[in-house]
Amino acid sequence: PNPTIDNVKHGVETFKKSGADYLIAIGGGSSMDTSKAIGIIIANPEFEDVRSLEGTAPTKNPCVPIIAVPTTAGTAAEVTINYVITDVERKRKFVCVDPHDMPIIAVVDPDMMSSMPKGLTASTGMDALTHAIEGYTTKAAWEMTDMFHLKAIELISKSLRGAVANTKEGREGMALGQYIAGMGFSNVGLGIAHSMAHTLGAVYDTPHGVA
């Protein structure tokens, strides 16, 4: 499910009660985005409401250390500086961009993705491919990001069908391809396809890769 404001509030409360020193985000983009929001608010308590972090977040402190373990090959949230939260009441998604939310460790292991059903593998894979294409065609693109995005397009194009069939080579190619795409678009942004997907996801609670 798409991460909500209430998910973040509950996570902040739970973290405070636990006395933990760091966060381990295991899952897809929703789990990692929720962890980023929790970690930022814990480290910057003046921002109690995650909605106040929309846009380029004005935080001063790095978030609580996050170890990200993606179980899908799509969002690349383990290597990006943004997170997306859903405002259920207003039926909208908002993006928070903050270099302080980058996980300190990313464990990108294709074996952790091998239990994904075919539909989820396909939809998250298309999200990764869209990242690479939009990142390559955005006006902010330059030589270094072109290198990332073109390689990601190559890997994903060769690997997605194999990943849906749950082959070892397909899973490995998708794990690397989506990661490289994240390294690229995190520097230059995305395009209108993602803007439309955020709207559809917020109104209909559609999974991001499908929207």
Residue ranges and their predicted role:
Residues D6-D111:
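Glycine/threonine-rich beta-strand-loop-alpha-helix active-site module
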Residues P1-I5:
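Short beta->alpha junction loops
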Residues V8, M32, M126, L150-I153, ...:
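Short alpha-helical patches at coil-to-helix transitions and adjacent helical residues
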Residues V188-A211:
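C-terminal catalytic subdomain
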Residues I41-P45, G135, V203:
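Active-site catalytic microenvironments for nucleophilic, acid-base chemistry
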Residues G11, T34-G39, A132-I133, I156-S159, ...:
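Buried hydrophobic packing segments
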Residues N82-V188:
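Carboxylate- and glycine-rich phosphate/diphosphate-binding segment that chelates Mg2+/Mn2+
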